Each structure stands twice: as structure tokens, then as C-alpha cells.
Amino acid sequence: MSLFPVIVVFGLSFPPIFFELLLSLAIFWLVCRVLVPTGIYDFVWHPALFNTALYCCLFYLISRLFV
């Protein structure tokens, strides 16, 4: 259960987890922009799985921050 209430924008109600998802997506984008030039993806077996796991870890950390 999050500390933030449901937010209503133009008649659409957004649960607090929606904003946590957006924040984790923004951080994921920044982390990917840093990791690609460093060449880490050359050592990754399956980049799509790596990206999915990275996003899940970031979302978990951010959602734990707001609880």
C-alpha cells in the first residue's frame, strides 16, 4: 500500500503505482544510455532479458522507497 492517494487528472484516476512505473522507466532509460557506450552489452547473453531484469530491479527499488 502506497502512501500517495489516487490522483485524478481530467476525470481519469491513476493509482500511485502508475507514477512509480513512470519514474522507474525514466531511470531505466538513463541507465541504458550510460550502459550502452560502456560496452557492457557485449558481455550480456540476451540483451532483452537483461533489460527486463534491470527494469524489474529498478521498479522494485523505487516501489520500496515509496512504501
Swiss-Prot record:
Q: Which InterPro entries match?
A: DUF1656 (IPR012451)
Q: Which domain of life is it from?
A: Bacteria
Record's note on what induces expression: Positively coregulated with aaeA and aaeB by AaeR.
Q: Which UniProt keywords apply?
A: Cell membrane, Membrane, Transmembrane, Transmembrane helix
Q: Where is the protein situated, by its record's location annotation? A: Cell membrane
Q: How does the protein associate with the membrane?
A: Multi-pass membrane protein
A Gene Ontology cellular component where this protein is annotated is: plasma membrane
The record lists the membrane-crossing segments as 3-23, 47-67
Member of which family?
Belongs to the AaeX family.
HAMAP family according to UniProt:
AaeX
- NCBIfam families recorded: PRK11594.1 (NF008615)
What is the name of this protein?
Protein AaeX
Q: Which organism is it from?
A: Escherichia coli O157:H7
Q: Which gene encodes it?
A: aaeX
